[in-house]
C-alpha cells in the first residue's frame, strides 16, 4: 500500500503513519534525511535517485553474504569485491533497507530508487571486528560498508544480520558492537542456536534451536519479534514453527522468515508475497549470484521494484 502526500516544496510538515512508505523529494542533489525539531514526526525529504518509472510490483534484491574473505568458495566474497558490489548497487539506483522494512512494506526511499536488502548469515568475525583502538577493522564487512557510506551517505550500513551465538567473536565487546550496528541503522535476526538442518529435526529440537537464540538476542535489546533465517534455507517439517510456537511456557513469534536460494524476491505488494518465505540471492560471482543478476538488470531482463 502506498501513501501519497501533497506538499509544498519547502517546509511541509505532515504527520506520517510509521508503517506506510513515505517518499519526498529534495530540491536538488543529495540531502541527508532530516526531521524537523519542531515536529519530529515530519516527512523526510529524500532526493530523486533516477528517472525510472515507478514499479512497485517489481522484484526486490535480497542479497545473502557469509564471509568477507579471499578464496574460491561460494560463501566467500573478497573485501574488494564486496566494496565493488556496494558501488555497483549504488550506481544502479539501489538504496538499502532492512528485512523488516521490506516485509512490512515501509521502505523509505527517494523517487526512482530500488530497495536492496543486504543480509549477512552466521555472524562470522570477518563481518564485524573492532581493533584495539576501538575503530572498526576496515577489512570487515562493516568496515568496508561504513567507509563506503562516508562518500555515499544515502547508502548507510542498514542491513539485517542473522546471528549465531558467536556474534562476531570478541565476547567482551559484544554489547558495544551490537549497540554500534543498531545505531548505524541495521537490525539483528535469529539464525538459530546450532545452525542445524531444521528439516531433519523434530518439533522439540526446532523450538529449542530457535528459542535459545531468540533469548540470547533479547538480552542485548533485540525485539523478541525479530526476523528469522532458517539455516540453509531449510524449513522444519512443521512450517508453522517459523511463525510462532510455545516452548517451556513461553510464546515465541518471528516477524519474517527467509530462504537461501538464488533469485530476487517478490515485492511486498505482489499478491503472492509471503513474508515467511521470501527468496534471497548469493553475494558471489557464481551462477545466479549478484554479478549474474546485476548483469540481467542492466540487460533489461529483470524488472526491479522502483519507488514512485
Name each model feature, range by range.
Residues 1-16:
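Sec-dependent N-terminal signal peptides
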Residues 83-86, 142-150, 175-182, 242-248, ...:
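Short amphipathic alpha-helical segments and helix-helix/interface helices
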Residues 129-150, 158-161:
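A short alpha/beta connector and helix-capping loop motif
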Residues 189-200:
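Substrate-binding clefts and substrate-entry loops adjacent to catalytic sites
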Amino acid at each position: 500500500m502506498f501513501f501519497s502526500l501533497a506538499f509544498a516544496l519547502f517546509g511541509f510538515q505532515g504527520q506520517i503513519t510509521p508503517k506506510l512508505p513515505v517518499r519526498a523529494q529534495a530540491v536538488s542533489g543529495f540531502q541527508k534525511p532530516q526531521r524537523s525539531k519542531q515536529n519530529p514526526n515530519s516527512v523526510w525529504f529524500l532526493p530523486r535517485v533516477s528517472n525510472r518509472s515507478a514499479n512497485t510490483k517489481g522484484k526486490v534484491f535480497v542479497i545473502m553474504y557469509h564471509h568477507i574473505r579471499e578464496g574460491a568458495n561460494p560463501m566467500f566474497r573478497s573485501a574488494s569485491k564486496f566494496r565493488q558490489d556496494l558501488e555497483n548497487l549504488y550506481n544502479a539506483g539501489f538504496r538499502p533497507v532492512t528485512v523488516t522494512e521490506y516485509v512490512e512494506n515501509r521502505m523509505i526511499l527517494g523517487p526512482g530508487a530500488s530497495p536492496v536488502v543486504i543480509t549477512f548469515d552466521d555472524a562470522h568475525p570477518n563481518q564485524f571486528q573492532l581493533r584495539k583502538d576501538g575503530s572498526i577493522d576496515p577489512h570487515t564487512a562493516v568496515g568496508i560498508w561504513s567507509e563506503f557510506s562516508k562518500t555515499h551517505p544515502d547508502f548507510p550500513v542498514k542491513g539485517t544480520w542473522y546471528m549465531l551465538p558467536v556474534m562476531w567473536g570478541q565476547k567482551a565487546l559484544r554489547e558495544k558492537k551490537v549497540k554500534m550496528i543498531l545505531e548505524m541503522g541495521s537490525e539483528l535476526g535469529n539464525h538459530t542456536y546450532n545452525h542445524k538442518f531444521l528439516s531433519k529435526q523434530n518439533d522439540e529440537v526446532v523450538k529449542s534451536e530457535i528459542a535459545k537464540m531468540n533469548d540470547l538476542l533479547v538480552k542485548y535489546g533485540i525485539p523478541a519479534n525479530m526476523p528469522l533465517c532458517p539455516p540453509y534455507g531449510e524449513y522444519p517439517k512443521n512450517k508453522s514453527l517459523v511463525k510462532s510456537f510455545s516452548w517451556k511456557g513461553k510464546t515465541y513469534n518471528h516477524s519474517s522468515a527467509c530462504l537461501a536460494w538464488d533469485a530476487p524476491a517478490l515485492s511486498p505488494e505482489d499478491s503472492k508475497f509471503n513474508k515467511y518465505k521470501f527468496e534471497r540471492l548469493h553475494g558471489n560471482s557464481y551462477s545466479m549470484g549478484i554479478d549474474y543478476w546485476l548483469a540481467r538488470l542492466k540487460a533489461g531482463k529483470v524488472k526491479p521494484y522502483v519507488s514512485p
